[in-house]
Each structure stands twice: as C-alpha cells, then as structure tokens.
C-alpha cells in the first residue's frame, strides 16, 4: 500500500529481451531498444539499470521481488506477450503460469495473449491458455510478424479479430486488453495504433469491456471521445508510471486530456499498470501518490464542464478500485491473503534498496559503482 491506498498493478511482464529469443532480428532489436530507451536515465539514479541487466531474460521471482518486496505494489496481474518476432513470446505464457502458481496471493491472475495472425492456431492457443491460466481477460497487440515481415491490423477486423472476441466470450472471458498508442517498431503501421477502431468493437460486443493499454500517449482526443461515449472502454495506464515520475506536468495534461469530453469522472475509468520490469515500479507510485493537477492547467481544461482537482478517492480507484470492480476482486480478501507472507514488511520498515533483492543484484551494484 502507498499512502494507505491498496495497489493493484494491472499489467506486469517478465520480458525475455535476449537475442536468442528473437525470431526476427530487426523487429526484436527494435522492440528491446524501445523498452530500454523508455526506462533509461531516470531522475533518481538509484533506479537506473545497465543494459546487460535490463536487456536480460527476466525470471518470475525477480519480477515478484521488484513488485512486492521493493515497491508498495500489493498484488499484480501477469500479461504474456504473444508477439511472433520473439520465439517464446516477449513474455512467455509459461512465466505467467509460473507466477500465478508460485505466488497466487500476489499474482492474482493473468491475461491470455494470442497472435491473431496464426488464425485457427490462435483460437487453439486461447483455449489452452484458458485451461492453464484461468485468465481474467484476453490481451491483443495490433502488430506481429508473419514469418517474413511485420503485419498490423485493426481491432474491428471482422475476419481476423472478431472470431477471437467471439471465442473469448464463449470461453467466459469478459475483458479484452488492446495495446494502442505506442508502435513497437520502425515500420509502417497505418492506423493500427489509433484506438478509434474500438468504436466498432465496443458497439458490436457490448458485453465485453475493452481496456486501451497505454491509452492517451497518442491519439489523446480520440481516446477521450471513446471514454465519454462507451461505458465499456477503460484505460490501462502502463507507461504513465514513467511519465508521472519524470514529467508530471505532461502526465497532468494526459489525464486532463482523457477527461476533456466526459469530465473528471473519467478518471474512475483509468487503472494503474507498470509493466513490471519495464521500469522499477516504486518511483512512479511515489510520484502518483503526491500528484495534483497544476491549477493553471485545471483552469483551461474541460470541453463541456470545468475539471476539478484529483481526489484521494480518484487515486484509490485508479490504484485498485476500478480494476477490482471490473474483475470482481475483493480487495479486503486480497489484504488478508498477503498479510504476513514472504514479501510483507513490518509497519514503518523501509523498502530495500532498488534491485538489491533480485538475482542480478551484484551486477547492478557493480554497474552503478562504475557509473558513479
């Protein structure tokens, strides 16, 4: 908990950045370099990581230590990444299964993730993951690799994507997370990262909820109109944890932009996500806990109504309440389940030094010593 508020991290990854995992060297290299660039040079150097450690094959116990021992994150949800430019996925289904099996009270669930380009094989993979993971939802990306080149698509494609929504619903899944806004490589993607294609999806599948992962980092106005118009569209704030730490005024502009059409109530359709090992989870939480909208931005925000200051209730919803309601999670039961476990700290005890509890702690310490 941070500032007395329970924290659910809605998306954690155990990345395998290693070249041995690249099916396509161009796209693989582009994606890992994008990830490292996002996390490089944090304001507080104690959260910096050298390339050798960052661009490694992260193991589940290290992800758990980062989230639950070294940060104020209480529980998390693991997302595998079925992007075919990586041989075993960028974050494998096996790691998601390991996380929820080894730490069930902390990794309270996982999403299934499939590559739509695989057609019937994607359907079979979804069915297998439903058996293995009992997933909370389905995660989709708008780009993958067809064996020769990157291919992108829209999330309202009736032949490629709608069969996945239909099968997910038949399998009991009610939630679909869609990566948007942040292209994953230096190649043409058309409008695949524009969330406007969710207009048709949200209309045609009103019984499903859609979370726009990275919503607001691009196509801000389009996203704001979607939030205002569709009650089954939400925002997963992954990467915004980095922005609130480093560029709080930009973070404020993003949140206010998302609320521009629908008003401050749209804040309660956003929920926290860090990406797990994308960047250390603690500094973003600390920055968000003390965050307020600059008054000059408030004075110039809102299309149809004035915006009010972010409240403690808004923060509680963004950190856990909204996601918990969406998925039927009992927060009090979660608190009881983690009380006194291996990650618990005595009241008032400080957090461990960043990266000191992971298996690569010695490498981190040596790199930071050389860098100083």
Q: Model features per residue range: what roles?
A:
Residues 58-65, 94-97, 122-126, 195-198, ...:
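Alpha-helical scaffolding within the catalytic cores
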Residues 136, 144, 150-272, 276-279, ...:
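Catalytic pocket-lining loop regions of alpha/beta-barrel enzymes
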Residues 53-80, 133:
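Catalytic domains of carbohydrate-active enzymes, especially glycoside hydrolases
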Residues 75-184, 189-191:
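Active-site gating/metal-coordination segments in enzymes
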